[in-house]
């Protein structure tokens, strides 16, 4: 009797142990991410050929205590390696596990490699060569809690690589995951008609057809780990292959189950057909190109098992929520008598189905933890509807009614105002209703939703549910394409993590504001390149700039500088610490046809630059951050703590008769007026002049001050 370990993703252990028992294994013991078992050689081969759930099969040679590098070396050295593989074969070592003296897996692998090479040499054999990528013979070592297990990778390449897949789609589903879905859903036991309306490259349907036809999952594989194992019994292995071929031939003739697969992407459907043909089951599966929301129900009852798109796969969160909401409608309307099983990593998407799960299971898709939910749609609760009547957006009659009504009201009022004002970007909603704690900004025909951090006492599930309601109801409330909704999360940043890139892709637009043009980037950063609440402040800067020298400190993307230049400034100096924002400011100037030597752009720490510059200005706009601890700054900056010292430095740059417009976004900011007046400044609050109509609901969004020479 030989000892083996069947490795598998976490969560597969119980189902795998049942599969091993059914195949005839003994002494079965579940472990973390796998199952130990015993079997004679012939059964070890059979399990390698027939296991649908295992990732790999390891033939265990040694298992024992390991508390030091010396013990690890001795354990590996004690194995009679020349009886396992030839020194003419290349080998590699896969080492798993950390802890104790094992600080990294490379160290463990190197120790075992040294022991193997030394053992060959000490037995008067020339040493075999190491080949990391494509070795003939792979050794597997697993270290856990002071114990080392050393074995031979009996199965070779990962067992989910069945050999029938040609190429993959954007988000391929591993074959053993598909098999686990079929087992855990109950389909494998019932073996009824099966539909996958998001079939992609066909993995779920192909695995199901192979199960139904008694086709061994390893029958199409060309390589196994035991190919270069010296005790390999080729005769026994060939007999098992012959048996598997015979069973497959009989199984295909007896299979009466119907399989249906569709996908909206014709390229994926073509790929699924090629994969099914490679697997020998193409004639059993009815593939078609179609939208899951409009397909006809192919049979009266059966199983629908699918892996629809989710956040990590192929989609925008808003359009995905719309999709799941519509899917729920489709299932309830037309799939009476069906069992439905859905794999997804986002419980909010699953909740958008509005179906009660009979069972919820955890199942990993690679490193991604997913929920695998099972539903039963009862026939008496369904109705047949025309596909054209499936809702395109969420029905605001039963979700987020107060939010939807408020958005509609705001939109009706602000859209007319914006056109009259000469702007096409504005704030549509700003946490008007406390339970819907988001800001909604409209940029042309796009919407950016910023989710504020909820108070700690509100459960995360509640905030997610409310955000889902917002995303589902917004498209119909204002008539916007769900794909034009962008979601961002704004929260208190910690450490050095302040304004960082969010995603690699860009979505750039050009917006117009009182005749000025600005570039927006809606996706790449938390902020879009234009602070909408400062719209009137920028306009004021432009109105005060004619015939004056202007300086814009903490300039961000230079939008106030553009207004100054368009307003007739004799010179404009734009200063910011970020190269990215300085370059962005230059782009904004170019957009407005502003190309002149009188426009200067300075990349510098503004606080330091103010101290060393010899330039003087007639108008200075300064809009510092509330707080900053950027790596480029020697010390942190806090606007309330440091504004007196900062404004003292700014005041020194001001020409007689000049003006400073100082603004910041710190709520409950307290201006040290007496300390500033003592330095000869005249201070006037101008909040009422700089708060746009779309921010009247949030009067504390910023505070603005006009500073001049006293007297």
From Swiss-Prot:
Keywords: Cytoplasm, Methyltransferase, RNA-binding, rRNA processing, S-adenosyl-L-methionine, Transferase. It comes from the Bacteria. CDD domains: AdoMet_MTases, THUMP_AdoMetMT. Disulfide bonds: none annotated. Residues 43-154 form the THUMP domain. Its main location: cytoplasm. Specifically methylates the guanine in position 2445 (m2G2445) and the guanine in position 2069 (m7G2069) of 23S rRNA. Belongs to the methyltransferase superfamily. RlmKL family. This is Ribosomal RNA large subunit methyltransferase K/L. It comes from Shewanella pealeana (strain ATCC 700345 / ANG-SQ1).
């Amino acid at each position: 009797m030989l000892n083996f370990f069947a490795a598998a993703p976490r969560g597969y252990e119980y189902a795998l142990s049942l599969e091993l028992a059914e195949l005839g294994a003994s002494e079965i013991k579940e472990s973390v991410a796998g199952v130990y078992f015993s079997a004679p050689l012939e059964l070890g081969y059979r399990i390698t050929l027939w296991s649908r759930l295992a990732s790999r099969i390891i033939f265990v040679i040694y298992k024992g205590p390991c508390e030091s590098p010396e013990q690890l070396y001795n354990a590996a050295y004690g194995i009679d390696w020349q009886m396992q593989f030839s020194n003419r074969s290349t080998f590699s070592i896969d080492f798993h596990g950390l802890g104790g003296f094992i600080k990294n897996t490379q160290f463990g692998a190197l120790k075992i490699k040294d022991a193997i090479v030394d053992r060959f040499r000490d037995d008067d054999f020339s040493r075999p060569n190491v080949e990391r990528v494509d070795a003939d013979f792979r050794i597997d070592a697993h270290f856990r809690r002071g114990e080392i297990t050393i074995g031979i990778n009996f199965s070779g390449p990962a067992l989910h690589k069945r050999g029938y897949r040609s190429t993959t789609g954007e988000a391929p589903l591993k074959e053993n995951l598909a098999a686990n879905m079929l087992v855990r859903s109950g389909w494998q036991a019932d073996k009824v008609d099966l539909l996958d309306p998001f079939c992609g490259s066909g993995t779920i349907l192909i695995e199901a057809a192979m199960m139904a036809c008694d086709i061994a999952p390893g029958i199409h594989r060309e390589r196994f780990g035991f190919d270069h194992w010296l005790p390999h019994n080729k005769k026994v292995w060939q007999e098992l292959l012959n048996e598997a071929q015979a069973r497959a031939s009989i199984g295909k003739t007896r299979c009466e189950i119907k399989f249906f697969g569709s996908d909206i992407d014709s390229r994926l459907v073509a790929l699924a057909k090629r994969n099914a043909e490679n697997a020998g089951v193409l004639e059993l599966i009815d593939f078609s190109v179609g939208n899951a929301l409009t397909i006809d129900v192919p049979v009266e009852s059966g199983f629908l098992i699918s892996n629809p798109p989710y956040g990590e796969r192929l989609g925008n969160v808003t359009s995905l929520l719309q999709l799941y909401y519509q899917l729920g409608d489709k299932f309830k309307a037309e799939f009476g008598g069906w069992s439905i099983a859905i794999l997804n990593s986002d419980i909010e998407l699953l909740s958008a189905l509005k179906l009660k799960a009979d069972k919820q299971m955890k199942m990993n898709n690679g490193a991604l933890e997913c929920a695998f939910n099972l539903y039963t749609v009862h026939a008496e609760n369904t109705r047949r509807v025309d596909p054209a009547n499936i809702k395109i957006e969420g029905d605001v009659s039963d979700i987020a009614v107060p939010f939807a009504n408020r958005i509609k009201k705001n939109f009706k009022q602000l859209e007319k105002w914006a056109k009259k004002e000469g702007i096409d970007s504005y704030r549509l909603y700003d946490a008007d209703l406390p339970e819907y704690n988001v800001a909604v900004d409209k940029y042309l025909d796009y919407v950016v939703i910023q989710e504020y951090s909820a108070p700690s006492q509100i459960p995360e599930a509640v905030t997610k549910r409310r955000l889902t309601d917002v995303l589902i109801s917004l498209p119909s409330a204002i008539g916007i394409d769900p794909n034009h909704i962008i979601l961002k999360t704004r929260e208190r940043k910690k450490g050095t993590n302040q304004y960082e890139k969010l995603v690699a892709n860009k979505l750039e637009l050009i917006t117009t504001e009182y005749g000025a043009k600005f570039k927006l980037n809606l996706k790449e950063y938390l902020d879009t390149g234009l602070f909408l609440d400062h719209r009137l402040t920028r306009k004021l800067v432009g109105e005060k700039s004619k015939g004056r020298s202007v300086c814009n400190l903490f300039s961000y993307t230079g939008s106030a500088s553009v207004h100054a230049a368009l307003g007739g400034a004799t010179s404009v100096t734009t200063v910011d610490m970020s190269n990215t924002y300085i370059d962005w400011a230059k782009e904004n100037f170019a957009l407005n046809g502003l190309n002149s030597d009188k426009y200067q752009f300075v990349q510098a720490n503004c606080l330091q630059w103010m101290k060393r510059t010899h330039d003087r200005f007639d108008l200075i706009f300064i809009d510092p951050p509330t707080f900053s601890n950027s790596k480029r700054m020697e010390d942190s900056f806090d606007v309330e703590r440091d504004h007196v010292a900062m404004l003292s430095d700014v005041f020194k740059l001001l020409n007689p008769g000049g003006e400073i417009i100082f603004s910041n976004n710190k709520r409950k900011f307290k201006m040290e007026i007496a300390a500033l007046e003592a330095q000869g400044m005249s201070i006037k609050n101008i909040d009422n002049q700089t708060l746009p109509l779309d921010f009247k609901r949030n009067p504390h969004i910023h505070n603005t001050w006009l500073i001049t020479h006293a007297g």
